[in-house]
Amino acid sequence: PFAHLYPMTLAESASTFAEMILTEGQLSNPDLNDAQKLAILDTETSNGAVFLTDLPVRFQFEKAFHEERAQGEVEVSRLKQLMAETQRGLFGETLEEGGEDPFFWASKLHFYITGVTFYNFPYTFGFLLSRGLFARFKEEGAAFLPRYEDFLRRTGQDMAEGVARDSIGVDLTTPDFWKGAIDTLLEPVAQLEELIDRNPGGEV
């Protein structure tokens, strides 16, 4: 009864699915040169990096903040510490010493949209859900489309788990679906690496 409005997770899924159709169509264009392919693949893989690293940092920080705020006021010094710790925890050794951005919480509007808490989470959820569904579409072809249309129709009638289960037949409560969605990024990464190797001087 509380799902009469479509959730942000499914809104992001639909928009990202459409982006993937466009990206796939562009990359299949035989007239595309290496520079154009490189630009498209760089965007796709860079987006993947943002959705799988930067946005989870935002979510984990916001979660930690809400937990501490429930106990009382959180000082600026503690906000900075929470942000730096979260960034270090997610990025690990890929983040150079002192490379944290402790004031990141102050520069992102999404943290201050009080009407939608944890606004960053739907982006990663929708990104991975759409990639998982697009992988099904590539496997099944046109036979997938009626179920995807049903998926879109059901938004606003149930939670994301129920919509995906009843329309597509996928279980979002198990790690396998999400792991498979992440694995779909391996192909564009490999294609990007091949293009870079083919043009070692950076001239494409």
Listing of model-derived features with the role each one plays in the protein:
Residues 13-25:
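Signal/transit-peptide handling
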Residues 1-16:
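Post-HEXXH active-site segment of zinc metalloproteases
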Residues 3, 20, 28, 35, ...:
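C-terminal, non-catalytic "cap/extension" segments appended to globular domains
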Residues 41:
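Active-site region of PLP-dependent enzymes
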